[in-house]
Curated annotation (Swiss-Prot):
Molecular chaperone; assists the folding of proteins upon ATP hydrolysis. Known to play a role, in vitro, in the folding of actin and tubulin. It comes from Thalassiosira weissflogii (Marine diatom). It holds the Pfam family Cpn60_TCP1. GO terms for molecular function: ATP binding; ATP hydrolysis activity; ATP-dependent protein folding chaperone; unfolded protein binding. This is T-complex protein 1 subunit gamma. Transmembrane segments: none annotated.
Length: 558
């Protein structure tokens, strides 16, 4: 042949690192195992804290899985993918980040024997996806519908979700604040539903924008018991003039996003002045322009004027003379919250103000000094769809950790408002899915049975980790729990009623004992649990299908 004797042809750069086939797959599994092991001890009420040093020399002490992984610097691409998975899951449902990483890692660990025995990844993925559908069916049959306005049930749900957090001593305060904040900002969506079940409870769409309308204001000092949710909003601004009123009952509020000062030219402007009269004319025109704007505002008799832009000294003079309190350079986000809480409409031009734009929903405006800062409070609002959460604590580290925990609690309440269904916690759901998949897997034949059963085995990692973090005998506890769920299956099959057996037994994360989760009052949102299982299985399938990793070399100067 003509090509005999030719040297090897180099397609990739000689500096490029490449791993393929089984080597790449096993490397990915080991990387996923390492990431899961980092946060394994942070699951449950008996979780350990992690101390992390950021690149700037700051210290972060937390047991929040997403926060830990965000601070960890990794180099392996699969480890980076797992960390991105945690971040995406946190944005989607706001809770369960630790569980999803541990579960995804266990799915990949259980796939390792199949990879080593040269079973094709597509067959493993097919078995995993089949098991996922079966697991979701089990969760659907097991879900319990809850009334969102039953505050005691919702509180017990949030308690079980944030009981492991650093602020567990003040759980009652945190839960009450989360519940009040979410119910304050939630409102029915005006988007029409086109589903056939439009009248069903699950089809009711709620708009709960806690990121935009539930502002957390952290003020160092005081005690954690001083934390509160305002029935209105507050922001860190002082009035523009010392003679303006600092306390007003039932104020009329006008919101602007236009400057109350002479408008500057948008492009460079040159004016030639030949004598003093021209200069005086220019100054007079500026004063008249500002005066006209102020008179247009004063005509509507507002008590408070808030603008996102500047307020000139002359405008302050007119407002103080008219007994109007003014604020300037307020953030757009804060202005939107004030608008939503007081019923005001943000106006762009003073000559377009209408009576309907004035907000009258606020019951009390007051300036207060906390520490060395002045804060404007808009309280006692009639129907505030926005709120401010005031957090007090001894140090910034404590405040940051409390904020993370409160955010988790609000996400839990938000998820229940969106989908008012619950599943038992404490590893009960995972063990039920595990036993259910084992029973269903025995009916399968062929090579897919192994991967299908591997998903069932992987689901046990949650109750196993809970028992491990409690310091009890893991083998004895998990075996007893598995036996209880298996016995429920046997009873269901013997009775022949065809329904899915509801065994609510799980692990008490504090003592490590087996308890009935329904009596114990530990529940988790249906949407979080289902999304955790979906994300874990789908990410494991994605990583298993990677058979080639090519690492490009960086160019010089970059």
């Amino acid at each position: 042949m003509a090509n005999q004797g030719m040297g090897p042809i180099m397609v990739l750069n000689s500096k490029t690192q490449r791993s393929t086939g089984r080597q790449a797959q096993l490397g990915n599994i080991q990387a996923a195992r390492a990431v899961a092991d980092i946060i394994r001890s942070t699951l449950g009420p008996r979780s350990m804290l992690k101390m992390l040093l950021d690149p700037m020399g700051g210290i972060v002490i937390t047991n929040d899985g997403n926060c830990i992984l965000r601070e960890v610097d990794v180099s392996h691409p699969t480890a980076k993918s797992m960390i991105e998975l945690s971040r995406a899951h946190d944005e989607e449902v706001g809770d369960g980040t630790t569980s999803v990483i541990i579960l995804a890692g266990e799915m990949l660990i259980n796939a390792e024997p199949f990879v080593r025995t040269n079973i094709h990844p597509t067959i493993i993925v097919r078995g995993y996806n089949y098991a996922l559908q079966e697991a979701l069916t089990i969760c659907e049959e097991w879900a319990l519908v809850v009334d969102v306005h039953d505050s005691e049930r919702v509180k017990s749900l949030v308690q079980s979700c944030i009981g492991a957090k650093f602020s567990s001593r003040w759980n009652d305060i945190m839960i009450d604040m989360a519940l009040k904040a979410v119910l304050t900002v939630s409102r029915e969506s005006r988007t029409p539903s086109f589903t056939p079940e439009a009248n069903d409870v699950y089809a009711q769409k709620m708009e709960v924008d806690i990121k935009r309308y539930a502002k957390v204001e952290k003020i160092p000092g005081g005690e954690i018991s001083d934390c509160a949710v305002l029935s209105g909003v507050m922001f860190n601004k002082d009035v523009t003039h010392s003679k303006m009123r600092r306390r007003i009952e039932n104020p009329r509020i006008l919101l602007l996003d236009t400057p109350l000062e002479y408008k500057k030219g948008e492009s460079q402007t040159n004016v030639e002045i030949t004598d003093e009269e021209d200069w005086n004319t220019l100054l007079k025109m500026e004063e008249e322009y500002v005066e006209n704007m102020c008179m247009e505002i004063i005509a509507f008799k507002p008590d408070i004027v808030i603008t996102e832009k500047g307020v000139s000294d002359l405008a302050q003079h007119y407002f103080a003379k008219a007994n109007i309190t003014a604020f300037r350079r307020l953030r757009k986000t804060d202005n939107n919250r004030v608008a939503r809480a007081t019923g005001a409409t943000i106006v762009s031009r003073t000559d377009e103000i209408r009576e309907s734009d004035i907000g009258t929903g606020c019951g009390l405006f007051e300036m207060r000094k906390i520490g060395e800062e002045y804060f404007a409070f808009f309280e006692e609002c009639k129907d505030p769809k926005a709120c401010t959460i005031i957090l007090r604590g001894g140090s910034k580290d404590v405040l940051n950790e409390i904020e993370r925990n409160l955010t988790d609690a609000m996400q839990v309440v938000r998820n229940v408002v969106f989908d008012p269904r619950l599943l038992p916690g404490g590893g009960a759901t995972e063990m039920a899915v595990s036993v259910g998949l084992r029973k269903a897997g025995l009916k399968l034949e062929g090579i897919q049975q192994g991967p299908f059963l591997a998903v069932g085995d992987a689901m046990e990692v949650i109750p196993r980790t809970l028992a491990q973090n409690c310091g009890v005998s893991v083998i004895r506890t998990v075996t007893q729990l598995r036996a209880k769920h298996a016995a429920a299956y046997e009873d269901s099959e013997t009775s022949g009623n065809g329904t899915f057996p509801k065994c609510n037994w799980g692990i008490d994360g504090t003592t490590g004992k087996l308890v009935d989760m329904e009596e114990f009052g530990v529940w988790e949102p249906f949407s979080v649990k289902v999304q955790t299982i979906k994300t874990a299985v789908e990410s494991a399938c994605m990583i298993l299908r990677i058979d080639d990793i090519v690492s490009g070399s960086k160019k010089k100067g970059y």
